[in-house]
């Protein structure tokens, strides 16, 4: 044992019990070699809660369960399995030969139980135990019984304890699982193909973000962890897979806050022979489908109710900014735009053009007002290097979906002109040379793919973590990621 580890009194007592188990010939960390579990806690209540005490006595229902001990009170023990809690009744007279091992049980131990279902005088479903076995001895006590694990940072750092101590946490992640399942169902019904594309990219692309860098020893090559799945998915459109999607991890070497984690989960989907309007329709239908299927159509934002089944609004970015600033940003030169930006205390980078400033003003003035589901359309070309232009070439056929002031989806009519795409990449490269670390690089392989012909298409990316936040009404992305990225703990 590491002599630097200081044990608490309870931890010392539990380790002493290991020796007592050993003296009794009882293994404390077993392989599972028993008859299979035949029921879980939620099924017990669903199947048998309507039976009376006498009916249960007559039927003699035999159950096999396992779980972690949460409480011990006289002859009653409550264990927790994956779906909830089960009460056990132990008559020590009937388990005389196991009385010594029974006496060594602690809260946190994992046990295996066979028994007969009964009801107590209070009408609680309970398993009367006729066989039990210790499967795993808990050497460290669980969080304090009545308060659970309340330190927020510690909850994220020790999610395993959080799941044991706070039953509602597990519900969040069941909801997350259901949301992802419904996303797949939505696209599978439309004959989309789910694919997996590389996480190691030699060229950055598909988004504006700083990457995590790594190195492949055998290839003697530097790689980036992907910041988006867009470019490989569009190559698949070129290859004739007309409907494609990917659910996967994305990595961005950026700040951490309530809506950003360096690694997160997204879905990107692409559809040939479609456009921005179809992408907005698909996105709205997807969110409504999930909300309806999960019974989560009404979301509370403090005193405001957000109705996910109502028609989503549509606004134009430049019009919204013009209205908020009382300045016509469709007809403005760069010097005037810079002057206005500085009046709002916006830091103007040397590579900024009018489009950058429109986007900055939108983020400052408009985003915070978007509570009900709203598509914001008409993004400037400077911040949309992969989107097709609108009739006014300064803007693109791009939209983002905002709900409760946060961005949930980014979609556009895909740019399929390889010559224009090269010009956009070159403009991005100039921005990178001028200090924009998030600008895209020139991806020659992607440009080559476009030269073979990308059909007219629409594409969309949705942050799944934020969607889970919305539907579970959580304020922090850390609440919906099992193991969020945390600062190293100071010892």
Swiss-Prot record:
Mg(2+) 1 binds at residues 400, 407. Binds 3 Mg(2+) ions per subunit. It holds the Pfam family tRNA_anti-codon. GO terms for biological process: lysyl-tRNA aminoacylation. GO terms for molecular function: ATP binding; lysine-tRNA ligase activity; magnesium ion binding; tRNA binding. It catalyses: tRNA(Lys) + L-lysine + ATP = L-lysyl-tRNA(Lys) + AMP + diphosphate. Its cofactor is Mg(2+). Its EC number is 6.1.1.6. InterPro entries: Aa-tRNA-synt_II, aa-tRNA-synth_II, aa-tRNA-synth_II/BPL/LPL, Lys-tRNA-ligase_II, Lys-tRNA-ligase_II_N, Lys-tRNA-synth_II_C, NA-bd_OB-fold, NA-bd_OB_tRNA. Keywords: Aminoacyl-tRNA synthetase, ATP-binding, Cytoplasm, Ligase, Magnesium, Metal-binding, Nucleotide-binding, Protein biosynthesis. Coiled coil: none annotated. It is found in: Cytoplasm. SUPFAM superfamilies: Class II aaRS and biotin synthetases (SSF55681), Nucleic acid-binding proteins (SSF50249). Belongs to the class-II aminoacyl-tRNA synthetase family. NCBIfam families: lysS_bact (TIGR00499), PRK00484.1 (NF001756). Homodimer. This is Lysine--tRNA ligase 2. It comes from Mycoplasmopsis pulmonis (strain UAB CTIP) (Mycoplasma pulmonis).
């Amino acid at each position: 044992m590491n002599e630097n580890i200081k044990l608490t009194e309870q931890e010392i007592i539990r380790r002493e019990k290991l020796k007592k188990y050993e003296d009794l010939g009882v293994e404390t960390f077993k392989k599972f070699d028993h008859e299979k579990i035949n029921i879980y806690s939620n099924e017990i209540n669903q199947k048998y809660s309507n039976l009376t005490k006498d009916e249960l006595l007559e039927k003699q229902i035999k159950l096999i369960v396992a779980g972690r001990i949460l409480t011990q009170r006289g002859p009653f023990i409550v264990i927790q399995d994956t779906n909830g809690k089960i009460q056990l009744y132990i008559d020590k007279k009937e388990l005389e030969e196991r009385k010594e091992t029974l006496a060594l049980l602690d809260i946190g131990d994992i046990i295996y139980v066979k028994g007969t279902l009964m009801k107590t005088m209070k009408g609680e479903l309970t398993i009367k135990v006729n066989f039990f076995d210790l499967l795993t001895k808990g050497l460290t006590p669980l969080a304090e019984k009545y308060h659970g694990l309340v330190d927020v940072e510690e909850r994220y750092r020790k999610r395993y304890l959080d799941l044991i101590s706070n039953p509602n946490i597990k519900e969040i992640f069941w909801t997350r699982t259901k949301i992802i399942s419904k996303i797949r169902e939505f696209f599978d019904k439309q004959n989309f193909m789910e694919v997996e594309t590389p996480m190691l990219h030699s060229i950055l692309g598909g988004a504006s973000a700083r990457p995590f860098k790594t190195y492949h020893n055998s290839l003697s090559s530097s790689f980036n962890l992907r910041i988006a799945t867009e470019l490989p998915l569009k190559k698949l459109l070129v290859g004739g897979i007309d409907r494609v999607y990917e659910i996967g991890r994305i990595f961005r070497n950026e700040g951490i806050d309530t809506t950003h984690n360096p690694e997160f989960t997204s879905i990107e989907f692409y559809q040939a022979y479609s456009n921005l309007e179809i992408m907005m329709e698909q996105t709205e239908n997807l969110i409504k489908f999930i909300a309806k299927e999960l019974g989560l159509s009404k979301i509370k934002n403090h005193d405001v109710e957000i109705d996910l089944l109502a028609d989503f609004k549509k606004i134009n970015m430049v019009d919204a900014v013009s209205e908020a600033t009382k300045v016509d940003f469709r007809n403005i030169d760069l010097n005037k735009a810079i002057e206005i930006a500085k009046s709002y205390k916006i830091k103007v980078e040397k590579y900024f053009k009018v489009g950058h400033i429109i986007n900055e003003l939108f983020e400052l003035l408009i985003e915070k007002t978007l509570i009900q589901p709203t598509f914001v359309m008409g993004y400037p070309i400077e911040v949309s290097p992969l989107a097709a232009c609108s009739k006014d070439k300064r803007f693109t056929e791009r939209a983002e979906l905002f709900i409760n002031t946060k961005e949930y989806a980014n979609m556009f009519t895909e740019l399929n002109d390889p010559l224009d795409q090269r010009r956009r990449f070159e403009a991005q490269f100039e921005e990178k040379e001028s200090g924009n670390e998030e600008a895209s690089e020139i991806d020659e392989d992607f440009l080559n793919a476009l030269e073979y012909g990308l059909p007219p298409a629409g594409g969309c990316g949705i942050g799944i973590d934020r969607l889970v936040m919305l539907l579970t009404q959580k304020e922090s992305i850390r609440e919906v990621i099992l193991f969020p990225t945390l600062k190293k703990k100071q010892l």
